[in-house]
A protein has these predicted regions:
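Active-site-proximal alpha-helix that buttresses catalytic centers in soluble enzyme cores
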Residues: 3, 8-79
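Short glycine-rich phosphate-binding loop at a beta-alpha junction
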Residues: 55-62, 85, 152-156
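Phosphate-handling substructures
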Residues: 30, 35-36, 75-139, 204-207, ...
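GST superfamily/GST-like fold recognition
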Residues: 159-163, 186
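Active-site signature of alpha/beta-hydrolase-fold catalytic machinery across serine-
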Residues: 72, 164-168
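His/acidic metal-ligating clusters that form di-metal
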Residues: 132, 154-160
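Acidic, low-complexity terminal tails and accessory targeting/binding regions
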Residues: 2-13, 93-105, 146, 151, ...
Length: 235
């Protein structure tokens, strides 16, 4: 690829943050239930705030736990943005009548090696399949990627939502996204490279937990603001 061609590539960087832990679920599956999360661990949010880009645009699902998580990041010293768009397509999978069931007992009933609540094409009773979730998440990503082309996008979402985004970045293979752990408050970065005839993804980090690193390991807490300019390339 010539230098002229490289200059026409637009890079959009997605910074996915999973919401903080839910403590009030009673050990039950909550899916799309609008349930609050625990944002009391200041050390976690201090660390997350350090690696997110200051000039990003913000998105979150329509569920309160993603908004509480964003508020906790801002309270940790991250400059609060002028606005944060609410994107219902980034909500967790609707698990229908499985919501409210004991999580451990339900998962114990699934086949050994299962990465999710069910096969990707199996809908929950009166709910969604993972493929339903994947389809709506991908459509929203494509739409936002056009609207925010060339920017940093921070999206506060859910485990299933982020697994779907990883599946898209892995070449549109949702089942591969399910193989990844996405822990609470973890950061996953997916870079999209677009030109007139090319659309490619790169996965710089998945399930990064910056609070685990000791402060003396400066490389684990690299700044992500304007001073860091990611390479604008396709590979």
């Amino acid at each position: 690829m010539s230098n002229a061609d490289k200059s026409k590539v637009v890079t959009t960087r997605w910074w996915w943050v999973r919401h903080a832990p839910v403590r009030s679920d009673g050990g039950n599956i909550y899916g799309q239930k609008d349930i609050e999360c625990d944002t009391s661990d200041r050390e976690v949010f201090d660390a997350v705030a350090k690696i997110l880009p200051r000039t990003a645009v913000w998105y979150a699902s329509n569920l309160m736990r993603t908004h509480q998580t964003a508020e906790a990041i801002w309270a940790a010293g991250f400059p609060k943005p002028a606005s944060m768009a609410k994107e219902a397509a980034f909500a967790e999978q609707h698990l229908g009548r499985w919501q409210g069931m004991n999580r451990a007992a339900f998962l114990a009933s699934r086949p050994v090696g299962s990465h999710w609540f069910a096969d990707i094409n199996e809908p929950a009773p009166d709910g969604e399949s993972f493929m339903d979730l994947y389809t709506r998440v991908c459509r929203a990503i494509v739409r936002i990627d056009v609207a925010e082309a060339g920017k940093d996008v921070i999206a506060v979402g859910h485990g299933g939502t982020i697994k779907a985004a990883v599946g898209l970045a892995l070449g549109g293979q949702p089942e591969r996204g399910l193989a990844f752990d996405i822990d609470n408050c973890s950061v996953t970065r997916l870079d999209h490279f677009a030109s007139a005839d090319t659309s490619l993804w790169r996965l710089p980090m998945v399930n990064q937990q910056p609070w685990i690193a000791d402060a003396k390991h400066a490389a684990m807490h690299q700044p992500a603001g304007p001073e860091v300019v990611p390479e604008n390339k396709l590979a």
